[in-house]
């Protein structure tokens, strides 16, 4: 998905809205993963779990409403695909630079004494 500067204002606004919604969706997913981690560790009370679940669901519902209202489902999906590829490539590049011990290349391991 590209945000071309020569697009008309509606296209630019739709693209920007799609980008913002995509980023917020990714943040909500990260929050959900953190909530699950905290639930599994037992650090949340039942009330906190309920409240957190309602808040996350409200965020997801609002994002879905916004995507429908602005007709940006396809654009959001495209941004997510593009971001998935970027992240996958970054992980692969990091993996290529890892040593078998998993601590990076020998050049990056200096003794600063």
From Swiss-Prot:
The keyword Transcription regulation does not apply. One of its GO terms (biological process) is gas vesicle organization. Disruption phenotype: A single deletion produces no gas vesicles. Its main location: other. Residues 90-100 have a biased composition (Basic and acidic residues). Pfam families: GvpK. Residues 90-113 are annotated as: Disordered. Keywords: Gas vesicle, Plasmid. It is found in: Gas vesicle. Induction: Probably part of a gvpF1-gvpG1-gvpH1-gvpI1-gvpJ1-gvpK1-gvpL1-gvpM1 operon, maximally expressed in early to mid log phase. Detected at low levels in growing cells, at higher levels in stationary phase (at protein level). Not detected in isolated gas vesicles. Gas vesicles appear earlier when grown in static culture, possibly due to O(2)-limitation. GO terms for cellular component: gas vesicle. PANTHER family: PROTEIN GVPK 1. Belongs to the gas vesicle GvpK family. Proteins GvpF to GvpM might be involved in nucleating gas vesicle formation. Gas vesicles are hollow, gas filled proteinaceous nanostructures found in several microbial planktonic microorganisms. They allow positioning of halobacteria at the optimal depth for growth in the poorly aerated, shallow brine pools of their habitat. Encoded in a 14-gene plasmid locus called p-vac which produces predominantly short, spindle-shaped gas vesicles during all stages of growth. GvpF to GvpM interact with each other in vitro, and may form multi-subunit complex(es). This is Gas vesicle protein K1. It comes from Halobacterium salinarum (strain ATCC 700922 / JCM 11081 / NRC-1).
